[in-house]
Amino acid sequence: MLIKLRFLIVSMLAIMLMSCGGYRLYINEEADFGFYQRIGVLPFSNLSGDRNATEKVTSSFLTELLIDSRVEIATMGDMLKSYRNVIKDERSNLPEQLTAEEAQALGKDANIQGILVGVVRDYSQVRSGQAEFPLVSIAVRFIDCQSGKIVWTYEITRKGGPKFPVFSFGETHTLGDMTAKVCRKVAGAFKETLK
C-alpha cells in the first residue's frame, strides 16, 4: 500500500513538471530600463495554425501589461497609425523583420522610447491520450527606439496539465486561461525589469 502511494505521488509530480514549459530570458545589462516612460506594443505575429491567435494573445498581453504598469503605454490605434506611416511595405510583424532604423522611426512617430513586438508560435489544443490540453508558445522582444537594439527578450511555452480524477489543482483546460497565464508571466517579467 505504501509503495503504491509513493508511486502515485511520484507519478503525479512528474506529470505536473512535464506540463510546465520553460522560459528563456535575455536582458541587456547595458540598457537603462528606468529611462522608459512611454512604450508601445505592436500586434503579435502569428506562426500558429489558429487564424485569430494574434488578436487573442496581443489583447491578453496588453491587458496584463496595463495592470499595475510602471510606464505609459501608447494606444494600439496610435501604434498602428505610426506603423503604417513608417513601414510602407506589406509584411507580417515578425520581430526579426523590424530593422533598427524602422524602430527608431516608429519611436519618433509614436513618441515612445521602446516597442514590444512578439510572435505566437503555438496556440492550440493538443491531444494527450483521450484528453486535450491547451498549448501556448510566444516570444516577446523589447526594442529600444533610440538605438534600435533588442534590450529584452522573453520566450515561453506552456501546456495545460492532465486531469486527475481525485486531485484537481494547477490544471488549465482552456486556451483562454492558458493565454492569460502565459501573458501574465511575460508581462510580469517585463514589469520587474522596469523597476
Task: Set out the residue ranges of the language-model regions.
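N-terminal segment of the mature soluble domain
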Residues: 38, 43, 48-113, 119, ...
